[in-house]
């Protein structure tokens, strides 16, 4: 990411309105939102069209280091959007920003997840890909602590992994899977998408979202 430009609040509100009035989605994911006003407008609009599962992926910084959330927007994220969520899916840097604590271990992930859980969502999935060793994600809920371990794939092409797994979780919830199975299936999916990712250009390449539909996998 080298540059970003915000859409107007009006077009974002209209997009939500048109989709929700047409198909009444069972699950909705909110990803990158950059400004305090857009966050507030999204929350106000979603209040008019409640869904069963709201997944919030608090995207803040791109893989290339580009800031995607204005500093002044963090408070609205915490105050308005996170409390509405069925599940919040921060990675380590995002969770550190939200909780103002350093996260270096799985136990730290649990502590940070509980801080975010107290902000109002039903579940928090702490994505541990930034830690060393196996890819360990931690699901925290009321009286729940579940560890999901996954294979670490030694490839540089991980652009979009966080957005992809949160979208996959949203899709599995909409299909009727419970929260644990939605996460398990989504982790399997993103692991394979990274394994068969694309070498394009000189930067961090994209994962291969459609690897299942190709007879010959791209390596």
Model-predicted segments: where are they?
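Conserved phosphate/ATP/ADP-binding segment of small-molecule kinases
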Residues: 71-145
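Short pre-catalytic strand/loop immediately N-terminal to key active-site residues, enriched for Gly-Thr
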Residues: 145-159
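Short, charged, surface-exposed loops that flank catalytic or proteolytic processing sites
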Residues: 102-109, 174-184
